[in-house]
């Protein structure tokens, strides 16, 4: 089974290609955990689809609201979201920087080939961790040892701190020299490293969700066409960016469990199960059209 599999496509933002959006721009005020972001329609539609799913899990009829605002001459649209503001700010800043470079015809890494459908590609890799602490079984009663809520909270804090310190992106794949070169994990790492990642890269942002045993990590990188080290002289060689285009506005996910973590508390060893979900998506800047669907 591939380490990255295609996710079910969930249309998030409605786009009406027949509507005229010229004139005074409508500002979208997004209240995200008490932090307010002001965005334009293009800024919002330019975000990766997987991030839009996190911001608006029930969908967003954006274009209908824009039309209503223009008809009633209201300048603002108000929306709310439950997503870490620091992660969103990092994503917005990165995309704004890439947009500015694209507008000024600045190529940060390497120019795209003629067959690429835009001026710049941005790879999003996101990891969502949820961890569970399992008390050991008492050898005398054959029943799980009881843990007080206060001790369980301290255990979760320790596990969270340990996971937060594990910043290397690919360490969780447990790749060894003995791992087969044809394994799904090594193929994934090879594809990403042929596109701009490095094997020792760290997550750019890694945070714990408040009051939850969850950790979210995000890394963005520009698609580097010159990093493709495949046999380009082979006429049948399939460039890596063609494979990544399969994830353009179609995020792919892979979920797996990791039981390699344990923690000792008051002389007792507790097993920790970690559920990881990776999301991979490609965003294309300078594309001719937005391929968004109506809810």
Curated annotation (Swiss-Prot):
Signal peptide (residue range): none
Cellular localisation: Cytoplasm; Nucleus
Superkingdom assignment: Eukaryota
Keywords: Cytoplasm, Nucleus
GO BP terms in the entry: mRNA cis splicing, via spliceosome
GO molecular-function term, one example from the UniProt record: RNA binding
Primary subcellular site in the record, as a coarse category: cytoplasm
GO cellular component, one term: cytosol
InterPro entries on file: SKP1/BTB/POZ_sf
Annotated family: Belongs to the WHI2 family.
Protein name according to UniProt: WHI2-like protein P4H10.16c
Organism: Schizosaccharomyces pombe (strain 972 / ATCC 24843)
